[in-house]
Amino acid sequence: MGACAMNPQALKGSAMLAAAMLLASGAAMADVAPQAKAPTIAKELQQAKTYTISSPPTAPLEMAKPALPALSGYTDAAMEKKIVRAKPGKISIRRMMQEDALKDFIGGDNKMAEWVVRQHGIPQAIFIDDGYMNLKDLLGKVPKQYLSETSPGVFLAKLPIVVGRKGILEIDKKTQELRLSQEAGSFLINDGQLFVRDTKVTGWSEKANGPALYKSPKEFRPFLLAWGGTETYISNTKMASFGYANSKSYGVSISQYTPNMAKVLKRPEPTGWIIDSEFSDMWYGFYCYETTGFVIKGNTYKDNIVYGIDPHDRSHGLIIADNTVYGTKKKHGIIISREVNDSFIFNNRSYDNKLSGLVLDRNSVNNFVADNEFYRNHTDGITLYESGDNLLWGNKVIANRRHGIRVRNSVNIKLYENTSMANGLTGLYGHIKDLTDTDRDIALDPFDAKVSLIVVGGELAGNGSGPLSIDSPLSVELYRVSMLAPTKSSGISFNGVLGDRQEEILDLLVRQQKAVLIDPVERQTELQD
């Protein structure tokens, strides 16, 4: 689709750009003129004098690229094998009160009023329990005022549909489209096993006789939520017009139960796969909370409202691969935030998003970000906030409006063989920031105002204000980094603490082809292993 058409162009453009800059920069790499220092950076110069420049051995920097997880097992055929159809399920219509899976939507703050108004009475839901049910089988078993076939294969649901703890619901190609009524307050809850394959599920406005298109954050729109202990599998499906600004109602959400309920229910973390599907006009394209091993592969997330893909709190072991994310209207294409650890983000394309292409945020550590393309995002290509011990390898970060790669308050960030080119500001920008006077909850999201980087290989070329700027680093190690001139200058210039020692650094890095270690004199702190 859009991505396929645009991707080769972006890469072709970057190759042409590189060739043009090689010609334009001429001997920029061999003959770098030190720039006159403006008086305004006196403080930086004073800091710079407290750093030593040395050439460490290169052997410890030579690292083989870690293996990425195989994706061949995550297929529709493998999904099909997981469906147990042996035991027919039971269907009932029950009141929404007293149901664990619905407590979050019924409890305090007069939450029940929403459903009373939409259903014109005591709120009810359709429940599938104790076995397998195909959505088409619900017809005839559920009164027509709650679920009807409006044209062949097109179903309109006017109540929430809940897959019970031992329930299995399959929505497949027998369903051309499932429409969840916005006016009647329909949504989909998985508390068991849910399979959505070869179909279409849409938040539907009966009034407009069309999708429940986004109008405002607080306006109810149908959504899908899977709770703790569940498995959710979606393949070759189009989902659109889900979600709004209300807890767990964001679009497609996979979430452990809330802490108080989780203590009582003791259900394991939820999991599942979403493959080869398309999500558009969602408040969040994907959200998860305390989720394990979830796979998001080969999907398109386009024109969603706040985020495309948003794994959150303490989710881990995720695979986010081969996705195309573009046109996110309010924030980032992909963001992992608050202790989302030990995950793989690779072979994705994220472009034309309102803020960054990818963000690693709030102490998300030990993640491997490889072989992605982040381009034409309206702020940074890749942003790391307060998230140390991450490895970025072989990413192409091109023509983003601000920095290519920005690293804030994050230590032991390893950047291998990345290309950061033609970005509006800096190719690679490392800095510290004191967040104590912000609205941040420091107990929930602690931070250290420290930054340290290892940069090996790759290319920093043609960025608007220079290849590299690092402010107050704990340490920086550079080796085999190719740098070409920024667009606004005849030669390379470093900003931040590197500026004062630029000639020394470039002599080692470019002319002598050695590694460079920039280390504060006062601490000489080693990078944490």
UniProtKB/Swiss-Prot annotation:
InterPro entries: Beta_helix (IPR039448), Carb-bd_sugar_hydrolysis-dom (IPR006633), Mannuronan_C5-epimerase (IPR053409), Para_beta_helix_rpt-2 (IPR022441), PbH1 (IPR006626), Pectin_lyas_fold (IPR012334), Pectin_lyase_fold/virulence (IPR011050). It catalyses: [(1->4)-beta-D-mannuronosyl](n) = [alginate](n). The keyword Repeat applies. One of its GO terms (biological process) is alginic acid biosynthetic process. GO terms for molecular function: isomerase activity. Pathway: Glycan biosynthesis; alginate biosynthesis. Disruption phenotype: Deletion mutant has a non-mucoid phenotype. Mutant produces predominantly an unsaturated disaccharide originating from degradation by AlgL. GO terms for cellular component: periplasmic space. The active site is at H312. It is found in: Periplasm. Changing D361N: Loss of function. PbH1 repeats lie at residues 229-256, 291-313, 315-338, 340-362, 364-386, 387-409. Its EC number is 5.1.3.37. Residues 1-30 form the signal peptide. Changing R408C: Loss of function. Catalyzes the epimerization of beta-D-mannuronate to alpha-L-guluronate during the synthesis of the linear polysaccharide alginate. In addition, is part of a periplasmic protein complex that protects alginate from degradation by AlgL by channeling the newly formed alginate polymer through a scaffold that transfers the alginate polymer through the periplasmic space to the outer membrane secretin AlgE. Belongs to the D-mannuronate C5-epimerase family. This is Mannuronan C5-epimerase. It comes from Pseudomonas fluorescens.
